[in-house]
Amino acid sequence: MAKANEIKRGMAISYNGKLLLVRDIDVQSPSARGASTLYKMRFSDVRTGLKVEERFKGDDILDTISLSRRKVNFSYIDGEEYVFMDDEDYTPYIFKKDQIEDELLFIPEAGLPGMQVLTLEGQVLALELPQTVDMEIVDTAPGIKGASASARNKPATMATGLTIQVPEYLSAGDKIRIHIAERRYMSRAD
């Protein structure tokens, strides 16, 4: 059991007889005094795969489910299935393309260290990515000298097809660090 304000992305809860996996959380702080903070959570139903959206107050009690996490690496693609291999015992975990469509935008061709598969009683639930990823810009408008003084942004496309807003001074070929959950530019990568 946990309060709604303690729930994080990637956790699983049991709610209204459904097993739900937290995909995204929006925090809404009301301006009125005495009003409680609302947590708008987007889930995916583990059994049906459908998307579910619910709102909770910060002190609402939710029934959390403990999941097992296994470190994995991307192995290969077999048609519409993506195979990830367990780092320790080499167990293959198979995902259909539509199950992990959003996550695929953040997995470069060389792979992404720190990925985990979430399982419950042997059933594969989701692929969890690390907080950040380093990627190379493949397409953007040319960099403008002296643009570091302004805070304007421009769209940049990565090799995976992901498009995010980056500062004007960056150009194609630059490596950048991206915050995965917020889909935003953080800094240049080392």
From Swiss-Prot:
One matching Pfam family: EFP_N
InterPro entries attached to this UniProt entry: Elong-fact-P_C, NA-bd_OB-fold, Rib_uL2_dom2, Transl_elong_fac_P/YeiP, Transl_elong_KOW-like, Transl_elong_p-like_YeiP, Transl_elong_P/YeiP_cen, Transl_elong_P/YeiP_CS
SUPFAM superfamilies attached to this UniProt entry: Nucleic acid-binding proteins, Translation proteins SH3-like domain
GO cellular component: cytoplasm
Recorded superkingdom: Bacteria
GO biological process: peptide biosynthetic process
GO MF annotations in UniProt: translation elongation factor activity
Family matches, as HAMAP family: EFP
Homology family: Belongs to the elongation factor P family.
Protein name (Swiss-Prot/TrEMBL): Elongation factor P-like protein
